[in-house]
Amino acid sequence: MLFRSPDSSVSIYERFTSLYDLMFRFNGYARSIERYLRENPLPTPAGARVLDAGCGTGLLTLALLRVLKRPAEITAVDLSGRSLQTARRAVRKRTHDPRHKISYVRANAVSLPFPDDSFDLVVTSGVLEYLPLSEGLGELARVLAPGGYLFFLPVRPSPATRLLEIMFRFKAHPPRAVAENTQRFFRVIEHYRFPPHEPIGWTKSLVLAQKS
């Protein structure tokens, strides 16, 4: 499998930030993610340290701000400066619990600028498809504290996924590889398939896992 360099990947999202943001704003992905999180609240403590690794234009960050019941410190990380700017603007425009604190960091998801065991919850979407799974998941495991949770949305192979692969120049990992590599670093709690009437289910599934 061919994996793109960080510079190559970020250039794609620098060029297509507006399209990416528009597409995910209107395709119902955000509603589906929020529905799941409201029905299945993440077990985060008050003051939880949360990392959105590869936040893009803020899809998961915004969902967390709306559904987390306890105050949290959210760090949104992306390699694309333009995506971070878009995420920051989106957060400013949305109403959310003012007890949440949020910061933005430009960094590479395979060399995160944080010490080991820095976060209680790590969320990510649209990042691991650009990386060798063992490398990407290993780095997320490194910064996640023991007992902490990983919430991610792997792209699953499908006809709709093939179009996204062409547009955004990534390659979906085989589901078996996702499962095996996740189990190397985490205890899998749930592998969730979205209902077929929700567009997110055409291209993504959801994995919740815990670091031992």
Which role fits each region the language model picked out?
Residues 3-44, 59, 63:
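Conserved class I S-adenosyl-L-methionine
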Residues 51, 57-110:
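Class I SAM-dependent methyltransferase SAM/SAH-binding core
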Residues 111-116:
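Short conserved loop adjoining the S-adenosyl-L-methionine
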Residues 123:
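A conserved beta-strand element that flanks and buttresses the S-adenosyl-L-methionine
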Residues 135-146:
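A short glycine-rich, Lys/Arg-flanked "PGG" loop and its adjoining helix->strand segment in the class I
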Residues 148-154:
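Conserved beta-strand signature within the Rossmann-like core of class I S-adenosyl-L-methionine
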Residues 170-185:
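Short alpha-helix
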Residues 194-212:
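Core SAM-dependent methyltransferase catalytic element
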